[in-house]
Amino acid sequence: MAISKQEAAWQPKPDDVPQLMDEADAGNAISQYNLGVCYAKGNGVEVDLAETVRWLRKAAEQGLPQAQFNLGMCLSRGVGVEKNVVEGTMWLNSAAQQGHAEAERILKQWWGD
């Protein structure tokens, strides 16, 4: 999983997860992203990479660049989902267009300038 060190540093307490789930279900993009991170890392829930991708996708579709980046990496590598480099690159491009530096770096590394 390609969650950056800064993003991975957030660690919910087990008691935080029910509220996070409620907020994510209500459509809060940041909570959806954070819930995806929880499922990726096993923070307050069992590790479930399919759930990681599901929540990242919901947040990415709302335009959250860190979710777009992580969804793009999951898709490009086949983590928690069938590998799809074309769709993964699309999400990385979306994140890069919003100034996500790591997405920009990876796209340059993969495809050149």
Summary of predicted features, one role per range:
Residues 82-101, 108-111:
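TPR/TPR-like (Sel1-like) alpha-helical repeat modules
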Residues 34-41, 70-77, 106-113:
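Hydrophobic face of amphipathic alpha-helices that form TPR/SEL1-like repeat modules
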Residues 14-17, 21, 29, 33-37, ...:
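Alpha-helical tetratricopeptide repeat
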Residues 2, 6-10, 100-113:
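TPR/TPR-like alpha-solenoid helical repeat scaffolds
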Residues 25-28, 41-43, 48, 61-64, ...:
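Short helix-capping/linker turns of helical repeat alpha-solenoids
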